[in-house]
Amino acid sequence: MKRIAFVFSTVPHGTAAGREGLDALLATSALTDELAVFFIADGVFQLLPGQKPDAVLARDYIATFKLLDLYDIEQCWVCAASLRERGLDPQTPFVVEATPLEADALRRELANYDVILRF
């Protein structure tokens, strides 16, 4: 089976990309355990708890990221540079446990995957 990487690079509530990516991730996890999740650029905002999507008439799907453990999705990475650029601390309590990696290390890790799906 091919190794699949899901890359979240967009803000959570401006488009449906994040929600659709999460749905695809959970569905794919039923078919393979060779997958990982990467949060880069504005995608790091997907990890923040306490969002108020109802203020912009959006659905609150962020809590669904907590299901990753239940689905045995354990490989979660977050770009440390993206966190810094957005004024976020790697010690922030995220909705899922994601390991911070510098950009070079993150690219090397991402290169280990056969398929990369970006949301």
From Swiss-Prot:
Keyword Repressor: no
A family per Pfam: DsrE
Complexes and interactors: Heterohexamer, formed by a dimer of trimers. The hexameric TusBCD complex contains 2 copies each of TusB, TusC and TusD. The TusBCD complex interacts with TusE.
Protein function: Part of a sulfur-relay system required for 2-thiolation of 5-methylaminomethyl-2-thiouridine (mnm(5)s(2)U) at tRNA wobble positions.
NCBIfam families according to UniProt: PRK00211.1, sulf_tusC_dsrF
GO terms under biological process: tRNA processing
Gene3D superfamilies in the cross-refs: DsrEFH-like
Protein name: Protein TusC
Compartment(s) of residence: Cytoplasm
UniProt superkingdom: Bacteria
Coiled-coil ranges (or none): none
GO cellular component, one term: cytoplasm
SUPFAM superfamilies, sorted: DsrEFH-like
Family: Belongs to the DsrF/TusC family.
Keywords from the named record: Cytoplasm, tRNA processing
